[in-house]
Amino acid sequence: MTVNRKKFIHTLSFSLAALWVQGGRMLHARTKDDARISDFCRKLKPIGRALELPGYYVWCNSPIEAPDGKTHVFFSRWKADLGMSGWIKGSEIAHAVADAPDKPFEVLETVLAPRGTGFWDATTCHNPLIKKIGNTYYLFYMGNSNGKTNTKRIGLATSSSLDGPWTRTDAPILLPGAAGAWDDHCTTNPAWVRGKDGRNWLYYKSWNTHDYETTKGPIRGNRKYGVAFADKPEGPYEKYVHNPVIDFSAKGANRQFEDAFVWREGDKFKMIARDMGVFNHEVGLIMESDDGLHWSEPQIAFQPLSHYVQEPPAPAHLKRYGRLERPMLLLEDDQPAWLFGASQGGKYQTSSAFIFKCEV
């Protein structure tokens, strides 16, 4: 068979050019995809599940290091017979301790339980966030009074020791906005940080009631984040006039997020959270800011749980199986050292903590 040399060279050149273009596209796509993955995400090493408790769902695992070097966690739990939705109408906040984040945890006690009729936290205590500010431990949390979302309010308990006793505020420390405001439905998911101005900055999640009641689709309403400021951790808090500071609704498709944790790293404010459609519903988000008010476009903070571990197929009663929620950090010298999250599944097919080491 005779091959025309000129035709062969032309065909080869065209093929190489096509491969170069295709390769370029592939490289561009890979580079574009890689740009979505944060350095934080690349440094995560999965440790595994913790706080798998028989008869309970476990959620919202907030860690802190004690003066003796032990790791304490304040977490939400509710009876398994309430199902996954029991967090809204029967959650309590408990306390556990371990020699280190990757060692077994011992549950010590319930520290905050719903107080019953007449109290703002009558029906649930959830979303714990433990902080040491000065010589006092501050346990921020969300409570409600009717077992529904529209009475979710951020409150506070304080103690001079991680072992208590804990004194609660008589009223919430941050209330929803006026009717019609973007945040008129509730205040929840507290995230505290010391601002560059030395004041107490409290980030919170909320949404609009009308949107919540009229939105069609699997997720009702659009969750946004605002911030409020106070001279003291217990308040009174004054909301930032240009709230919300993070709002993904303009991206379309009801994109939103929740479960933010905020910290200061050098001159930057940083935030880690759970994605609700910006990339997908299975990953985490990470953002940064120079001033805590204007935030960068998000990158991926962590992958779906299946990226790190192989688990049994999802049981029918767990609809949010396979993803990490409620990300919380244990910091060392203001740097992320450990990531604590919550995930459905585990030994008792309820939910538990899931821990990562943040490798330097």
Give each language-model segment a name.
Residues T2-V360:
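Carbohydrate-active catalytic/glycan-binding domains of CAZyme proteins
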